[in-house]
């Protein structure tokens, strides 16, 4: 069963890769068509485009690193190639996490209702808040790249001094653990911010939903259904985001203890987030949902 596990998970990875490219590509395409026709895009549409592009990059990086790890090819990559591969992975992962976090803050400020003066101040300046957070996240990216570059330089110096297979393998595992630990630590900040934002948004939606149900008791108020669906989507978003962060954390621990099966399983589950969450974004966005249903109807009609 253990020998069959890599083959099974590889098939799952490829399926997630295809789904992720289709869903994120769909978001980019529909918003691009809308931008060409209207000559303008809303703030949320711009966020969705950049998020979808970063996720496409992340999905490709995960697929490449999967096959490199599967066949132990990463240790044969040159210093420049290794830097390009790891830096691309870090950049795509950074923007995927931070843009999802920024999207959660955007939804919180746009949808939630709180009487706090601080919240109202941020709500009135939502575009500036989003821009400042995005620019601030670049500081984390810069520090992350510096730290990772130090790990790469240290490993290359040791690798050039001893090229035996056993040394290369054991030292590369140590290097990989250091890289994964650094990524986990830098992922903690956007995850914490997103967790707080989603929790506040869920609390606000739940509170508002209860009020609406009391006011329209015995009636099927359309707005109640809209808020219920929004609540379900937000909770699903939170669960997927949390599972992705936990996969990063557990994959680091499993690599530390050299548990290959758990590591591979976490990588597979981790790819489910950037692949599947885009479908939630499509279903939660009226324009994207309408376009998706139209495409689905045309495809179904041709069968």
From Swiss-Prot:
Entry keyword annotation includes Glycoprotein: yes
Location of this chain's protein in the cell: Membrane
Signal peptide range: none
GO CC list: plasma membrane
Topology of the protein relative to the lipid bilayer: Multi-pass membrane protein
Keywords for the protein's UniProt record, in alphabetical order: G-protein coupled receptor, Glycoprotein, Membrane, Receptor, Sensory transduction, Taste, Transducer, Transmembrane, Transmembrane helix
Domain of life: Eukaryota
Sugar attachment sites: 162, 166
Family from the record: Belongs to the G-protein coupled receptor T2R family.
Name of the featured protein: Taste receptor type 2 member 13
């Amino acid at each position: 069963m253990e020998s069959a596990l890599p083959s099974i998970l590889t098939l799952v990875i490829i399926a997630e890769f295809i789904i992720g490219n289709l869903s994120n590509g769909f978001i980019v395409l529909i918003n691009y068509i809308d931008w060409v026709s209207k000559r303008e895009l809303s703030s949320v549409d711009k966020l969705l485009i950049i998020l979808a592009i970063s996720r496409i990059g992340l999905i490709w990086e995960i697929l490449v690193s999967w096959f490199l790890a599967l066949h132990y090819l990463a240790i044969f990559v040159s210093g420049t190639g290794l830097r390009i591969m790891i830096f691309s992975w870090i950049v795509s992962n950074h923007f995927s996490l931070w843009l999802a976090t920024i999207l959660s803050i955007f939804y919180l400020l746009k949808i939630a209702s709180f009487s706090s003066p601080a919240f109202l101040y941020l709500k009135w300046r939502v575009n500036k808040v989003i821009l400042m957070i995005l620019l601030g996240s670049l500081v984390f990216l810069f520090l992350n790249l510096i730290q990772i570059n130090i790990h790469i330089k240290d490993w290359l110096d040791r690798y050039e001094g001893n090229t035996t297979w056993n040394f290369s393998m054991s030292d590369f595992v140590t290097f990989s653990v250091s890289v994964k630990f650094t990524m986990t630590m830098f992922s903690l900040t956007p995850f914490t911010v997103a967790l707080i934002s989603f929790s506040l948004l869920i609390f606000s939606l739940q509170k508002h939903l209860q009020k609406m149900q009391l006011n329209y008791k015995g009636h099927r108020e359309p707005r109640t259904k809209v808020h219920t669906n929004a609540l379900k989507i937000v909770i699903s978003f939170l669960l997927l985001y949390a599972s992705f962060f936990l996969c990063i954390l557990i994959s680091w621990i499993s690599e530390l203890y050299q548990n290959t099966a758990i590591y591979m399983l976490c990588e597979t589950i981790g790819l489910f987030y950037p692949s599947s969450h885009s479908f939630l974004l499509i279903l939660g966005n009226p324009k994207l949902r309408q376009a998706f249903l139209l495409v689905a109807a045309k495809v179904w009609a041709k069968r």
